[in-house]
Amino acid sequence: MPDKTRILVTNCNTTVAMTEEICAGARAAAGPGTEIVGLTPFWGPESAEGWVDSYLSAAAVLDLLRDVDEPFDALVMAGFGEHGREGARELLDVPVVDITEAAAHLACLLGRRYGVVTTLERSCGQIEDSLLTAGVAQHCAAVVATGLGVLELADEARALAAITAAGARARQAGAEVLVLGCAGMTRLVRTVASDLGMPVVDGVAAAVKLAESLVGLGLSTSRVGSYAKPLAKQRQWGLPPTTSQGCQGPARA
């Protein structure tokens, strides 16, 4: 294991304040020899809520990662239920830990069934699909929406009330452990656990600790089969090139 472990943490949206909040949670969980470096995509949605946002976010994060020129030992992807983790594993030669997967795996060590509390109802399907792909969906009792958008979580009192109510519904559905299904909920983990009287797993903290463990064990993504390096070919990244007439292509909203 290196003397100092450097972990990149990528926000899935363009809101810098949320990146800072995520990194504060990551640093609180990290060991004394770990440096946390936060990254915010240059383009994409201000908050990821729904399929369009998720796919746009994934492309923006991959576009960001391909140009990182500073050394790092692992990547934490801080978008709960968002797309892109498989692409990042192809792209990078270091361990890639997604907060959705990390939280679910740790929750399975603490109880037989876990529940997820998330933001809007429209995000539940994405989270269910992500858990299924990760192989941990069979232990999920429920994915429950709070009804709050990602940016609305900044109102701490309102967020706490909504998360606690959703957590109680997940417990009634059979959850023995609760997973916070948005990186913007990180700061509330201890209060929610106390209010509900059950273990609560924060995905950011879980992902950081798993990333540290993988680095310490000298393990990284397998290149056999699924996550082989991308094929060599021409790819057009980011914005479209200027046309031969010197004009940009059509504007996009």
Segments and roles (model prediction):
Residues 17, 108-146, 157-158, 213-253:
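Short, glycine-/small-residue-rich phosphate/pyrophosphate-handling segment
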Residues 5-29:
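N-terminal beta1-alpha1 ligand-phosphate binding loop
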Residues 32, 91-94, 110, 139, ...:
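Short, structured coil segments at secondary-structure junctions
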Residues 125-183, 188:
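Active-site rim beta-loop-alpha module in soluble metabolic enzymes
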Residues 38-62, 151-156:
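N-terminal beta-loop-helix "entrance" segment that forms/cooperates
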Residues 9-10, 72-79, 174-183:
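Periplasmic-binding protein-like
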Residues 58-112, 116:
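Glycine/small-residue-rich loop that forms an oxyanion/phosphate-binding "nest" at active or ligand-binding sites
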Residues 94-101, 137-143, 198-205, 221:
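Short hydrophobic/aromatic-enriched beta-strand-loop microsegments
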